[in-house]
């Protein structure tokens, strides 16, 4: 069957009242970013639904791109015909023939918002249903649990027909809740935190700390690959790679071993917060899970958070490891995260880190070093890249041809 468009139904946007237009606009932007390598498609957003006009693009490829985009409740490959009963009959028959299985069942569900169409909803159901039955021998009607549900939507601009409804990712369009910086390590937890923040409409920019030669280029690439996984949900993720070697070496030399991790996290947070300010972000997201490691006790969080008044969002804070792993597997980040490349959170880790560090002592230890200058230097040398889901898909396809 040759579909000419995708019909997108909104999720929670239906509850957003006066802000609805803003949410629809943001969703349209995210859909457009996910289709950047498909210049022929056109996106048309309306108050209660959105259309992607395919113009010859592969509908199955478009379908795969739509599945992870937050803000979509469901979507359907569809065809549009003129406001003509005979055209509707022909399209309906073709759709059901394409979708049905032998000895299957079907129903017609029509909705007419354009009152000038000659048939009302019940008459459409009856006439189109009868026409399909007359032209297909191995098909029966089941109005309660059909194998194929033919949806017909009669509007002023035409009649839209579809037979499949595909569940979307739901949630809110990424960016509709503002921007935040995601502290993205190479571990399991932070990509999951980024995914959950995106689901609630937060546009994330990833911040990754890189400490060569202690951390390798493979570790850096792993973080970029994780950002690419997260880009599926918005179309694109900005990633900031922070050179952190000098700061970590100074911390190791100047700070007592038992609180190295606490001070390291404080410096990371200070850098991330300054990046947030420069990028007009509203919050910081991280993958901390309460009690999982020494730096994630309440006392440690208190000492680390003291460097900023910015809200810290911790989407996985109450989850145990198995719950986090399940989500990581679902979003296809787990296998990347467990690759054995050290990141800067694992180097210089003391054998017995303090789980209840005292803020006054931490600040005293830090006072003997000019961390301000080191932070400024790191900020001046940040590498920023844009990770785009469409470009990532193209690279995958190119490599696939080699094997």
From Swiss-Prot:
THUMP domain: residues covered: 60-165
Pfam family of the protein (one): ThiI_fer
Single GO molecular function: ATP binding
Any single GO BP term: thiamine biosynthetic process
Localization in the cell: Cytoplasm
Catalytic activity, reaction form: [ThiI sulfur-carrier protein]-S-sulfanyl-L-cysteine + a uridine in tRNA + 2 reduced [2Fe-2S]-[ferredoxin] + ATP + H(+) = [ThiI sulfur-carrier protein]-L-cysteine + a 4-thiouridine in tRNA + 2 oxidized [2Fe-2S]-[ferredoxin] + AMP + diphosphate; [ThiS sulfur-carrier protein]-C-terminal Gly-Gly-AMP + S-sulfanyl-L-cysteinyl-[cysteine desulfurase] + AH2 = [ThiS sulfur-carrier protein]-C-terminal-Gly-aminoethanethioate + L-cysteinyl-[cysteine desulfurase] + A + AMP + 2 H(+)
Binding site for ATP: 183-184, 208-209, 265, 287, 296
GO cellular component: cytosol
EC annotation from Swiss-Prot or TrEMBL: 2.8.1.4
Pathway: Cofactor biosynthesis; thiamine diphosphate biosynthesis
SMART domains assigned to the protein according to its UniProt record, in alphabetical order: THUMP
Lineage top rank: taxon: Bacteria
Swiss-Prot/TrEMBL keywords: ATP-binding, Cytoplasm, Nucleotide-binding, RNA-binding, Thiamine biosynthesis, Transferase, tRNA-binding
Family (UniProt): Belongs to the ThiI family.
Known role: Catalyzes the ATP-dependent transfer of a sulfur to tRNA to produce 4-thiouridine in position 8 of tRNAs, which functions as a near-UV photosensor. Also catalyzes the transfer of sulfur to the sulfur carrier protein ThiS, forming ThiS-thiocarboxylate. This is a step in the synthesis of thiazole, in the thiamine biosynthesis pathway. The sulfur is donated as persulfide by IscS.
Name by which UniProt lists this protein: Probable tRNA sulfurtransferase
Organism field: Listeria monocytogenes serotype 4b (strain CLIP80459)
